[in-house]
Amino acid sequence: MPIYILIERSVKNGRIDFWNEDAIRTLGKAILDRDYSLRVEFPENRLCPMVPNRATYIRYIHDLLSSTSGQKDKKRIIGLDIGTGASCIYPLLGCRMYSYDFVGTEIDKFSFETAKSNILQNNMESQIKIVLRSKQDCLLPDTEGMEEFTFVMCNPPFYEHEEDFINFKQNPPSGVCTGVYHEMVTEGGEVGFANKILTESKKRKGIQWYTCMFGKKSSVPAVVDKLREQNISNYGIYELALGKTKRWIICWSFQAMRPHNELIRPSSTSLSKYFPHKVLQNWTLDPELCAQIDDILQKFLDDNKIPWSKKGSVLEISTKSITWSRKARRISKSQTSVSSLEGQMKCELNVIDNQLQCKWIEGYDYNVYESFCSALARALRDNKK
């Protein structure tokens, strides 16, 4: 039956009835068909995902990868979707939107078979592989001869206890819940599930980014505390707000590339104590300083023996040691070589309008970046005198 006929049957007085399971499934099918040319079946006895926030999660991952991949990184992108569900929504969207390849895992045989059917009817069997797992298996499967996964994504089950799920089913906040027990309940809830991924991730550091999307704001502090406890400093928080629904994504990586501020630090400050360090510093330049800024920056870099190159209007900095601190200068005076204080870091300097920006691009130690910015700020102040 054509989608538009199904939509007509699901709309009353110009509105979608979000308490009607058939209406929810029909809306999802219509959006996927119209916006992504995807034909997807949502079985009546399984979770029907909200397409807009799923698509936003995929876009977020694309932006995350784009902001932390060098120009030479043109390799195949392979995503792992843990608990892909009957709809197989994330792999289908990822393949359609960005031509990613995917492996999806599923513990439920019915959802596994339905996901495979959705893949086949969209002719994506060469891009998407679904793997049937058990609850006892680790969450990160072997690559089975393929390249390592580029990223991991997951919507963990929300609830820790069955009674919480039953109460939610009876009193949902804004619409009917079509999910079944194994899709909504897990030991430890979504925090426990994310912590399992975190534990396993320490043995798979070649994966560029791990991500989890949470339905409870209270889960964010618990997971960030665990990341900090494990000394994982390259992490981020991202808030999705679509209509009345809010979701939170936490990402982490064992690699050195640093994402843009807007991908790891929400504009809302309610979780600010759990934010990672800023990766962008700004200084406002007065007209006189702005006119001299190129000479000032090059003198600062050359005087401190900081390697740099210019690409258009951007100064690219790549250091292997700290040469700008007072301690480094004392050491260099007593030695014939440059200071051996460790300080591997890459950053970019750029002037936009009357703003000097310093963007942290790569590095493991925030203190090195902060120290560089402090030295640069002193140089700017000295030139204002």
From Swiss-Prot:
Q: What is this protein called?
A: U6 small nuclear RNA (adenine-(43)-N(6))-methyltransferase
Cite the binding residues for S-adenosyl-L-methionine.
Answer: R54, G83, E106, N155
Q: What class of enzyme is it?
A: transferase
Q: What is this protein for, i.e. what is its function?
A: RNA N6-methyltransferase that mediates N6-methylation of adenine of U6 small nuclear RNA (U6 snRNA).
Q: Where in the cell is it found?
A: Cytoplasm; Nucleus
Output the Gene Ontology terms for molecular function: U6 snRNA (adenine-(43)-N(6))-methyltransferase activity
Q: Keywords in UniProt for this one? A: Cytoplasm, Methyltransferase, Nucleus, S-adenosyl-L-methionine, Transferase
> Pfam families this protein is in?
Methyltransf_10 (PF05971)
Please tell me the species this chain comes from: Schizosaccharomyces pombe (strain 972 / ATCC 24843)
EC number(s) on record? 2.1.1.346
GO CC terms of this entry = cytosol; nucleus
This enzyme catalyses:
adenosine in U6 snRNA + S-adenosyl-L-methionine = N(6)-methyladenosine in U6 snRNA + S-adenosyl-L-homocysteine + H(+)
Which GO BP terms, alphabetically? mRNA splicing, via spliceosome; rRNA base methylation; snRNA (adenine-N6)-methylation
